[in-house]
């Protein structure tokens, strides 16, 4: 009996190819055209997207990307490539490909890369610790579209999320402990997750519950009292209500109330990116300090740390 050959597909959101208005416009057009991300009526959404949002938003967002751009590309791409390479080194007999929902390298190129290695089973690991229809769901949709065009398809194991995975929680906890050891224990540990429209949760997306699960498990692993850990949501877009409390408004309120020292972690981001390095580490630092706070540190994402790579290896091992 022939032994099954397994490949691993690491999936993440994506990034512009360069910090220019043109590249950002291409990326945002693809991203904001996905119904999993924005499900507004196309009749209303297309004119708004093409006539207002892309022309106005692309130059501004390009400047933000330029402020965090690294020698090897955007932070998300640099750290994602490091994750892919480190996992491939950890699992030398298993092909590992990287694919993005939007931009390059695409999910389709990742699937084709694995099929060229003659794999007949693919373990898909979306690097979103907490499930959401707007992220993990988008990977599922695109994977289905890709495979629908194939005459022969491999077996697929799809990891929905890992919000309460023991290795993941321990890696987060060790990262927090290292920050506390370096900067001192703060008055409050704030866990900021990417937001989604409240309507998505009302319609069945269990993302907020998965975020609460991670928050609870991390606080327990750290032995911290509930009042010392707070969960908020960032990066809202558009006018409809998103999950609350909002990170920026919470930081302003805490600074005004006299909270002096805060450390912020973003457990929902497997790799540092614009939303962590610019929005959280820079913009929200200014919000907190400007409101009266005294000390603010951002705790980096797990990125390609050995603990994170070991977590990935253990996570996919059950499906190989």
Swiss-Prot record:
Q: Name one GO biological process term.
A: heme biosynthetic process
UniProt-annotated binding residues for Fe cation: 194, 275
Q: What does this protein do?
A: Catalyzes the ferrous insertion into protoporphyrin IX.
Under which main EC class is this enzyme filed? lyase
Q: Which reaction does it catalyse?
A: heme b + 2 H(+) = protoporphyrin IX + Fe(2+)
Query: What is the source species?
Result: Shigella dysenteriae serotype 1 (strain Sd197)
Task: Outline the subunit composition.
Answer: Monomer.
Places the protein is found: Cytoplasm
User: Which pathway does the protein contribute to?
Assistant: Porphyrin-containing compound metabolism; protoheme biosynthesis; protoheme from protoporphyrin-IX: step 1/1
Protein's name in the database: Ferrochelatase
**What keywords tag this UniProt record?**
Cytoplasm, Heme biosynthesis, Iron, Lyase, Metal-binding, Porphyrin biosynthesis
- Gene Ontology molecular function terms on file: ferrochelatase activity; metal ion binding
This protein's superkingdom? Bacteria
Record's GO cellular component terms: cytoplasm
Give the similarity note.
Belongs to the ferrochelatase family.
Kindly indicate whether the keyword Calcium belongs to this entry.
Answer: no
Answer whether the UniProt record assigns the keyword RNA-binding to this protein.
no
Enzyme Commission code: 4.98.1.1
The record's annotation in InterPro entries points to: Ferrochelatase, Ferrochelatase_AS, Ferrochelatase_C, Ferrochelatase_N
């Amino acid at each position: 009996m022939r032994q099954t050959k397994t490949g691993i597909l690491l999936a993440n959101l994506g990034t512009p190819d360069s910090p220019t208005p043109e590249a950002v416009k291409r990326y945002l057009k693809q991203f904001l055209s996905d119904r999993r991300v924005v499900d507004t009526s196309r009749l209303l959404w297309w004119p708004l997207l093409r006539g207002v949002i892309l022309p106005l938003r692309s130059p501004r967002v390009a400047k933000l990307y330029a402020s965090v751009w690294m020698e090897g590309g955007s932070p998300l791409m640099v750290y994602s490539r490091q994750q892919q390479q480190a996992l491939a080194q950890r699992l030398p007999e298993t092909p590992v490909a990287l694919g993005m929902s939007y931009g390059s390298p695409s999910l389709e190129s990742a699937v084709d890369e694995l099929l060229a290695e003659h794999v007949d089973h693919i373990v898909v690991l979306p690097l979103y610790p907490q499930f959401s229809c707007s992220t993990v769901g988008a990977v599922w949709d695109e994977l289905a579209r890709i495979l629908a065009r194939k005459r022969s398809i491999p077996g697929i194991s799809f990891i929905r999320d890992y919000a309460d995975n023991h290795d993941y929680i321990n890696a987060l906890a060790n990262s927090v402990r290292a920050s506390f050891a370096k900067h001192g224990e703060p008055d409050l540990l704030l866990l900021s997750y990417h937001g989604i429209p409240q309507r998505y949760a009302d319609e069945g997306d269990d993302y907020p519950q998965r975020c609460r699960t991670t928050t609870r498990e991390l606080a327990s692993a750290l032995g911290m009292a509930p009042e010392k850990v707070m969960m908020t949501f960032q990066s809202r877009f558009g006018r409809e209500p998103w999950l609350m409390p909002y990170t920026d408004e919470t930081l302003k309120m805490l600074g005004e109330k006299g909270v002096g020292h805060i450390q912020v972690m973003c457990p929902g981001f497997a790799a540092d990116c614009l939303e962590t390095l610019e929005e959280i580490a820079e913009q929200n630092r200014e919000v907190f300090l400007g409101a009266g706070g005294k000390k603010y540190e951002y705790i980096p994402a797990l990125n390609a740390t050995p603990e994170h790579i070991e977590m990935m290896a253990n996570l996919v091992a059950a499906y190989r």
